Regions:
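S-adenosyl-L-methionine
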Residues: 97-151
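Acceptor-substrate binding/catalytic loop of class I
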Residues: 173, 203-225
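A short glycine-rich, Lys/Arg-flanked "PGG" loop and its adjoining helix->strand segment in the class I
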Residues: 155-156, 176-191
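A short acidic, Gly/Pro-enriched loop at the edge of an enzyme's catalytic core
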Residues: 148-162
C-alpha cells in the first residue's frame, strides 16, 4: 500500500488565500447531514455514459475534497490530484493514509454507492468502495490555472477526463480571468476527452466562517458560450439547488441556502476530436 506524503509548503501558496483552513472549509461545505450532493450524482451519471474503463483522469483544483474524485474512481483507471494550495493536498493525503485525524467521507461514499445502483450499502460496501478510490490515485501535482499549462507543458492534452469543481469560479472576481482559467483547464484534455465540473451560480463571493473569498459571478449562459466556442459537443448544463441539510430539504427551495448563493451549475461535455 502506498503511503502518501505531501509536505505542507506554505511559502509558495497564494497570499490571497493565506487564511485558508481546509478543515473549516470541509466542515462548512461538506456536513454529514445533507439530502443530496448533486455533483456526486452528476459524476455517477456521466462517468458511466462518457468514459471508457481505461481512462486517465485528473482533478484540477481538487481542494481538500475527496467525494468528487472518489465518485469518478469507478469509471477510470488512473487518477491524478492537483491543487494550488499544498495544505489541501496534505489534507487528502491524510485520507489516503487513513490517518486518525482524516476527514470522514463515509456518508458521501454511502451516497455515491446509492447513485451507482446499490440500494442499501453496508459498512463493508463503503470500506470496499473507499479502497477502490484509494487504489486509483497515481500521484499529486501542484497546479496553477492562471498558467497556459496549469500542471506543466508535458501534461497538455494528456487526459481522457478532466474534473474541476468550483475551482476557476472561486478564485477571482473577474469573469475574463475565469474564462482564461477555464481554457487552461480544458487544455489538459485529449481530443474526445470529457470535462466534468460544477460552479457556483450567480455568486460574487463565498464565506468560510466570517472570511470572504472571491467568486466570478458566472451562470449557465457563460458556460454554454465558453464550451461551445472551445469545441465541446454533447454539452450538459443543469441548474440545481446546492446540497441542503436533511431537516431543511423541504423548505430550502424557497429560501437561500446561504447569503452568497443557493444554486450550482452541473457541467459535462465532450471535446470534439
Amino acid at each position: 500500500m502506498n503511503t502518501w506524503n505531501y509536505e505542507m509548503r506554505t511559502e509558495k501558496d497564494s497570499k490571497e488565500f493565506n487564511t485558508w483552513n481546509p478543515v473549516a472549509y470541509l466542515e462548512e461545505y461538506f456536513p454529514r447531514d445533507v439530502d443530496i450532493e448533486p455533483v456526486v450524482k452528476l459524476i455517477a451519471e456521466e462517468g458511466i455514459k462518457r468514459l471508457r474503463p481505461n481512462a486517465k483522469a485528473i482533478d484540477v483544483g481538487c481542494g481538500p475534497t475527496v467525494c468528487y474524485w472518489s465518485a469518478l474512481a469507478s469509471h477510470v483507471q488512473e487518477l491524478y490530484l492537483s491543487d494550488y494550495l499544498t495544505i489541501n493536498l496534505a489534507q487528502i493525503a491524510k485520507w489516503l493514509n487513513r490517518e486518525s485525524d482524516m476527514y470522514d467521507w463515509s456518508y458521501y461514499t454511502d451516497m455515491m454507492l446509492k447513485f451507482e445502483g446499490l440500494e442499501n450499502p453496508s459498512q463493508q460496501d463503503i470500506i470496499k468502495r473507499e479502497m477502490l478510490s484509494r487504489s486509483k490515485i497515481k500521484g499529486f501535482m501542484r497546479c496553477d490555472i492562471s498558467l497556459e499549462n496549469p500542471v506543466g507543458v508535458s501534461q497538455r492534452g494528456e487526459y481522457d477526463c478532466v474534473l474541476s469543481v468550483c475551482c476557476a469560479d472561486s478564485i477571482t472576481y473577474n469573469k475574463e480571468d475565469w474564462r482564461k482559467y477555464m481554457k487552461n483547464i480544458f487544455s489538459l484534455l485529449k481530443p474526445d476527452g470529457v470535462f466534468l465540473g460544477s460552479s457556483m451560480r450567480n455568486c460574487t463571493h463565498y464565506k468560510i466562517g466570517d472570511i470572504s473569498y472571491p467568486a466570478a459571478n458566472v451562470n449557465e449562459d457563460d458556460f454554454k458560450e465558453l464550451m461551445s466556442d472551445y469545441g465541446f459537443k454533447d454539452i450538459r448544463i443543469d441548474v440545481v439547488y446546492e446540497s441542503r441539510p436533511i431537516v431543511d430539504s423541504q423548505i430550502r427551495k424557497t429560501e437561500d441556502l446561504r447569503g452568497e448563493y443557493d444554486q450550482v451549475l452541473l457541467i459535462a461535455g465532450t471535446l470534439q476530436g
